[in-house]
């Protein structure tokens, strides 16, 4: 069957990504990260496991504010254990691993959202290509970590949900949502790759889970013991988005000192 493209209202999209009633919702994902270097065979560098807790807040103009927090941990691809130190296979240097701890990650939803309807399922496709000045490139202290003047990546998302729940006016959120996420991005600053040619390829998938207790146990343990801030989404929009690059800059001294990441963050 050929997919039919339908324009969905903002409220229907909010049901996919979070919930209409202001309650928070959780996503979880797993995957792998590979090196992609000209003239070299790929290397599977890491497995990953991650989560997001999000909330949508209605505005008077029928738009919605989206606010969230997200974690992703880099795992040993053989053992599945959390990596705190990593031996760089190109330089031989052992570096501190800086896991993803982004708070907040925010957005603003309005207008129509095209979905590919295929009978019982509907898929939303978002191909994003963020390109902007690299804030680390302006400082000499980061030249061995991220010297490129421009940050450039590709983020490819596919979110699939039950069509009936999407269109049902009585539901505030879909009970099932499956996400596929692929990414092409630069070396992470903590890898200390300097100006070496190449990229990272991410291949991951995940789903919406009912609550915190359905997250992978590794994430529950880390959040409970180290970063309880990530048990809950913000109750209202916060400041500028946190990214892996701004987080690295903020905690650069802790990285140099070999501290364990993510840096502890207390519950609000």
Model-derived regions: residue spans:
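N-terminal segment immediately downstream of the Sec signal-peptide cleavage site
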Residues: 1-75, 206, 210, 221, ...
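Intrinsic disorder/low-complexity segments enriched in polar/charged and small flexible residues
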Residues: 15, 31, 66, 88, ...
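A eukaryote-biased signal for long
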Residues: 130-268
């Amino acid at each position: 069957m050929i997919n039919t493209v339908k324009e969905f209202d903002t409220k229907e999209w909010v049901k996919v990504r979070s919930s209409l009633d202001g309650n928070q919702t959780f996503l979880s994902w797993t995957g792998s990260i590979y090196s992609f270097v000209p003239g070299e065979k790929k290397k599977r560098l890491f497995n990953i496991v991650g989560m997001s807790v999000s909330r949508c807040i209605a505005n008077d103009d029928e738009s919605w504010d989206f606010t969230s927090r997200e974690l992703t941990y880099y795992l040993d691809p053989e053992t599945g254990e959390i990596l705190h130190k990593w031996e760089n296979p190109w330089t031989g240097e052992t570096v501190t691993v800086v896991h993803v701890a982004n708070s907040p990650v925010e957005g603003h939803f309005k207008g129509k959202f095209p979905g590919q309807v295929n009978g019982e399922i509907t898929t939303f496709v978002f191909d994003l290509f963020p390109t902007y000045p690299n804030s680390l490139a302006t400082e000499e202290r980061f030249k061995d970590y991220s010297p490129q003047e421009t940050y450039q990546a590709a983020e490819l998302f596919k979110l699939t949900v039950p069509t009936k729940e999407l269109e049902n006016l009585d539901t505030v959120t879909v009970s099932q949502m499956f996400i596929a996420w692929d990414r092409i991005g630069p070396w992470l600053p903590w890898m200390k790759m300097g100006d070496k040619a190449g990229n990272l390829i991410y291949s991951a998938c995940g789903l919406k889970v009912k609550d915190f207790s359905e997250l992978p146990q590794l994430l529950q343990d880390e959040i409970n013991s180290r970063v309880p801030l990530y048990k809950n989404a913000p109750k209202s929009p916060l400041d500028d988005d946190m990214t892996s690059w701004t987080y690295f800059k903020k905690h650069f001294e802790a990285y140099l000192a070999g501290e364990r990441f993510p840096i502890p963050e207390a519950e609000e």
